[in-house]
Amino acid sequence: MKPNIHPDNYRTVLFFDSSANEGWLIRSCAETHGKTMVWTDGKEYPLFSLDTSSASHPVYTGKQRNVNTEGRASKFNQRFQSVMSSFRKDK
């Protein structure tokens, strides 16, 4: 590897997916904002928290979550209809 081609903050970083309780040690320049975590080897590493990863994403795990499929427009129409019905009763 050529010397002096990597940034100064190129170091081993712990990427940790808290929803799956899994982590990976990877050399990276990712900004960790001073957060650290002790890993299974007993050493403390800079911590980059992940919202989702291959360990927790439904596409990779095969587990689907129940998601409310009702859209924003239909929710608005329901609220608007209740307002309009109360308005019509007043007249």
Curated annotation (Swiss-Prot):
| One Gene Ontology term, aspect cellular component | ribosome
Q: Which UniProt keywords apply?
A: Ribonucleoprotein, Ribosomal protein
**InterPro entries reported for this sequence:** Ribosomal_bL28/bL31-like_sf, Ribosomal_bL31, Ribosomal_bL31_B, Ribosomal_bL31_sf
Task: Output the superkingdom of the source species.
Answer: Bacteria
Tell me a Gene Ontology molecular-function term this record carries: structural constituent of ribosome
In its UniProt record, which GO terms are filed under biological process?
translation
SUPFAM superfamilies listed in its UniProt record: L28p-like
Which PANTHER family does the record cross-reference, listed alphabetically?
Answer: 50S RIBOSOMAL PROTEIN L31, CHLOROPLASTIC, LARGE RIBOSOMAL SUBUNIT PROTEIN BL31C
Entry similarity comment: Belongs to the bacterial ribosomal protein bL31 family. Type B subfamily.
Subunit composition? Part of the 50S ribosomal subunit.
User: This protein is called what?
Assistant: Large ribosomal subunit protein bL31B
The scientific name of the source species is Neisseria meningitidis serogroup B (strain ATCC BAA-335 / MC58)
